[in-house]
Amino acid sequence: NAKPPA
């Protein structure tokens, strides 16, 4: 699952 940058 691709997570957006923090």
Curated annotation (Swiss-Prot):
GO terms for cellular component: extracellular region. Expressed by the venom gland. Disulfide bonds: none annotated. Transmembrane segments: none annotated. Keywords: Cytolysis, Secreted. This is Cryptide Pep-11. It comes from the Eukaryota. It is found in: Secreted. May act to induce hypotension. Presents moderate hemolytic activity at physiological concentrations (micromolar range), and weak lactate dehydrogenase (LDH) release from mast cells. Does not induce mast cell degranulation, and antimicrobial effects. In vivo, injection into mice induces increase in nociceptive sensibility and causes moderate edema formation. It also reduces locomotion, suggesting an increase in anxiety, but causes no alteration in rearing (standing on hind limbs). Its main location: secreted. GO terms for biological process: killing of cells of another organism. It comes from Tityus obscurus (Amazonian scorpion).
